[in-house]
Regions:
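Sec-dependent N-terminal signal peptides
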Residues: 4-14
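Boundary of Sec targeting at the N-terminus
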Residues: 18-21
Length: 224
């Protein structure tokens, strides 16, 4: 679930100006960015774009180096801090990721994505009390944000807190009724709680929204 929420919130491709492409296309785009950057090595905009392609190709170290350069020139660059935190987390550099999130929050108190990223990072880094306090604060500050509820639900599932997790996924669904990820996660919670009929209802709803039934075959098998 954590990976799902990070993908939803970080929106790496969209936020960095990248679009869905094949790996070959991505490598071509990266190569072009490198060539242009060679003529404009001080361009922070170009370095941010190159880092976007590095992220798309999961070249975490190269992306980090670009964000390092940008932040040496502009230490309050919000986007660079945010994405470097993500890149640091992907490399297992949790201490550095935490510092980036915390620095970002000092610059922009209440920054939604940074607060969420920090809560999920602390959950992953075995800091359960901090993580839960942070995600509860996020939900309290954003009571109409579906992602906040879904993120808390994901943390609760990891802790086997299935009743509150179902509540949070239900709230997320109420706020974003056609989000298939939220419904699938609620179906999972219901299966974990032994409520197969209700889990199947969530799967049926997803099919009704256009998700191919064939994509859910394994989930339907669990509901038998």
């Amino acid at each position: 679930m954590r990976k799902l929420i990070l993908a939803l919130i970080l929106g790496i491709a969209t936020a960095n100006g990248a679009t869905a492409q094949t790996r070959s296309d991505l490598r071509d785009s990266l190569s072009a960015a490198v060539q242009v950057l060679a003529f404009h090595p001080d361009s922070l905009e170009l370095r941010m774009k190159k880092a976007a392609w590095n992220i798309e190709l999961e070249q975490w170290r190269y992306a980090q180096e670009e964000y390092d350069f940008v932040l040496r020139c502009d230490e309050k660059n919000i986007a660079a801090l945010f994405y470097r935190a993500y890149v640091n987390e992907r490399q297992g550099r949790y201490k550095f990721a935490r510092l980036d999130y915390e620095n970002l929050l000092r610059i922009v108190p209440g920054h939604f994505e940074a607060m969420l990223g920090l809560a999920l990072l602390n959950q992953k880094d075995n800091r359960p009390t901090e993580a839960f306090n942070q995600i509860n604060t996020l939900v309290a500050q954003h009571p109409n944000n579906a992602v906040a509820y879904a993120a808390r639900g994901g943390i609760e599932v990891e802790r086997k807190m299935y009743t509150p997790a179902e509540y949070d996924f239900t709230r997320a669904i109420e706020l974003d009724p056609k989000n298939s990820d939220y419904r699938l996660n609620r179906a999972n919670v219901r299966l974990l709680a032994g409520r197969k009929k209700e889990a199947r209802e969530d799967l049926d709803a997803m099919v009704g929204f256009g998700v191919p039934r064939a994509n859910l075959i394994e989930w339907y098998k669990k509901c038998r």
